[in-house]
Amino acid sequence: MDKILRVDMGAEGGPTFRVEPVGEFAGLGGRAMTTAIISREVHPLCHPLGAENKLVIAPGSLSGTAASMSGRISVGCKSPLTGGIKESNAGGQAAQVLARLGYAAIVLEGKPESDDLYKIFINKDGVEVSVDNSLKNLPNYPLVEKLKGQYSDRAAYMTIGTAGEMKLLAASIACTDPEKRPTRHCGRGGTGAVMGAKRVKAIILDDTGLKMRPPKDPEKFRDANRRFVEGLRKHPITGEGLPAYGTNVLTNVLNEAGAYPTNNFRTGRFENAAKISGEVQAELEVKRGGIATHGCHRGCVIQCSVVYVDKDGKYVTKQPEYETVWAHGGNCGIDDLDVIARLDFLDDNFGVDTMDTGAAVGVAMEAGLIPFGDGAGAIRLVEEIGKGTPLGRILGCGAEVTGKVFGVERVPVVKGQAMAAYDPRSVMGIGVTYATTTQGADHTAGYSVGPNVLKSGGDLDPLKPEGQVEMSRNLQIATAAVDSTGMCLFIAFPLLDQPETFQALLDMIGAFHGITLTGDDVTALGKSILKMERDFNTRAGFTKHHDRLPRFFLKEPIPPHNVTFQVTDEDLDKVFNW
Amino acid sequence: MRVTVKLFATFRKGRFDTEVREVPPGTTVSNVVDGMRLPGSVGIIFVNSRHAVPSHELSDGDTLAIFPFVGGG
């Protein structure tokens, strides 16, 4: 990964590209790369959908190697949803393929004057940027179906659906899985809208004829990878829970904890949660003959994904993740897994974030457009997004826009981005992360749910503010570093609980680059990323007053614990004091 | 006294989802767990939706929820 591809979509006479040496960005991967380029090169006051914004796509620093779990790809830009810096990452095949092609980043710059739609093809022989207006208005599934006949079987696809073309604020970028289904999304923050603004419909990556990236010290690398995989396999979360039940194993846990946001964050318990739980989902999938364990990218040993089929055994979607099951399920009072799976498919097909879309539907229910629990109504609403009707465009711009248009006060967002499946009143640690992360409400930015609820990586009382600031700080630093390696964030469970697995990862990175890496180096990397992101957001106009939860979380106690969010503003302002 | 015991994930296999049990006063979470020969360690314990430790003494009418270590997100 010694080069960067820059495509100027706004060049006179049509897009041009140049391949540059990686230069000052050498050694960076994933979020470290996207953040470094955006913070240095994008004007913080630019319009996110304008020519001044850039879309940076970067494989992790270990992607394309034999390292297990290294298939995350990061996409960065100034977010049209939050107005701040954005890094959104996804699994699928793209990271491994792009890394083997030798690109540390693709940077899409400028925007075309014309209405033409482009595709970008990259293989070992070079880069081709071409007009393909036959792709206009295609949702992700038919789009990939049409493209895959034209390219090698090894190709991976990064695409936008109709939502991205319409530049909706919750639009995602889809990455294909090993079966070439557009199921893994850089979902958060509207990165798909930025790709749409640049009129790029598809990026096709083909690594035919290329090999895995070789480590500097192959023997040490192999040994470290073996110890790393052993650690993942022996940890109960990555070795048992996730492969058996997928991420939706959390529904019952959060519901039992009284922290499962129900009916647009009115209560912390959903009476029908059991019906949409991971346990019931897994049973149903096995009964119907779906594929019970599946990796979203080659080289994954956790295999938390599944193929979800209908009662006739016909493909519906990939197994909806916990956050999706919640956003379209309990958050909307919906208790039917088939309805949720259909909504997951629609989101993937149109290319929108499942969390912001589910939260928008919840807000629409709060506004009285349809009642809570109305599954058929929720499907109709999400179909409006695909049709591009005025209502669909509002919903496809996420919960905040929907709340503003329909006059709703209870809108669960920070910096314009919807919260995930944990109420910040009854899991105060995640409230600190939602409030303070540079990304807008984002549970993955510092997953305090681990020590608060799951008792992994520490033990804090979720109903008390004590210790939450320090925990969120440490997790935000560690996460920024992990997001730069291309590693799936689920490795954090064994990493935090098993020092020898953390050491194995350090050894593996070290052996790849032929250096010795320590925990302090990882911390320093994480801090440097957060510092760049905070600095960008400050220059974009963000102040400490944006690091706050909506006031209703401080005023309305949530049952069953009847608590409000109790971390003080003064303490929230200490998260980035290190 | 009566307590409701709920099991989740792998702990359900060959056992039950929910069971109401008659237990003597002074029964702790450990007493209940030990009698079930669960596969693997107990990860998360809730008594009436609050985290509890194995030595927690149950009261009449309590709901005890027992999970292995699970995660996602």
For the regions a protein language model found, what residue spans apply to each?
Chain B
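Ubiquitin-like/PB1-type beta-grasp interaction modules and other compact soluble beta-rich domains
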Residues: 1-72
